[in-house]
């Protein structure tokens, strides 16, 4: 239970961090060729008759992306940083030291070129999924070829607020991350995650009103 967790865990550190992120705008061009079929069955006397129609299908399109985030800190676990999305970028503000008290402000150690590989993978996966979504209505689809090419990619640098909690429970170390804007929590613990989230939020939410999303470029 969460009560047992609270009683038996030992908090090693809880810290608000402005994590460096690269926010990418981009466009992907997609082309695909497919073999598709529609099979229909009906009964004729004692027999089940199946009719299959075959189609050559082509798809061409563009996908536009706005502010796809990738954290630029090797010290932050990528899985945690990806999982606490989304952030509401309408709240982005110009840099001001007024937002920094009580938070660490980390600097990127992975530049936009290094992080581009990760964001392109995300964009390609999303574009491929959107392409496949247009292939509904068929009973079977075989991919013959797909080409997904980036046409533009523009990075922007921002600092986004994250709460990090390091704790030890039953001789194991656990790491939690919480979106400092929305309160979304990610972390692995073999107890009720909802109750742990409420407990963690009780510590940090009173300070969330002091945070902001900071746009640097």
Report residues per predicted region.
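Juxtamembrane/start-of-transmembrane alpha-helix segments at the extracytoplasmic/lumenal side
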Residues: 188-201
């Amino acid at each position: 239970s969460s009560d047992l967790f609270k009683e038996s865990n030992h908090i090693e550190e809880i810290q608000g961090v402005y994590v460096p992120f690269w926010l990418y705008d981009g466009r992907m061009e997609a082309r695909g060729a497919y073999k598709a079929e529609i099979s229909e069955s009906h009964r004729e006397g004692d027999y089940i008759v199946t009719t299959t129609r075959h189609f050559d299908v082509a798809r061409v399109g563009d996908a536009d992306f706005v502010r796809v985030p990738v954290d630029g800190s090797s010290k932050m676990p990528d899985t945690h940083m990806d999982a606490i999305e989304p952030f509401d970028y309408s709240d982005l503000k110009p840099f001001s030291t007024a937002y920094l008290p009580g938070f660490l402000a980390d600097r990127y150690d992975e530049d936009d070129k290094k992080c581009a590989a990760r964001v392109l993978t995300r964009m390609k996966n999303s574009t491929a999924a959107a392409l496949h979504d247009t292939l509904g209505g068929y009973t079977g689809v075989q991919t013959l070829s797909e080409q997904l090419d980036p046409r533009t990619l523009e990075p922007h640098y921002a600092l986004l607020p994250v709460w990090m909690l390091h704790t030890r429970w039953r001789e194991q170390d656990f790491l939690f991350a919480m979106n400092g804007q929305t309160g979304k929590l990610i972390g692995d613990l073999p107890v009720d995650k909802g109750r742990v989230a409420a407990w963690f939020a009780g510590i940090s939410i009173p300070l969330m009103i002091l945070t902001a999303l900071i746009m640097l470029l």
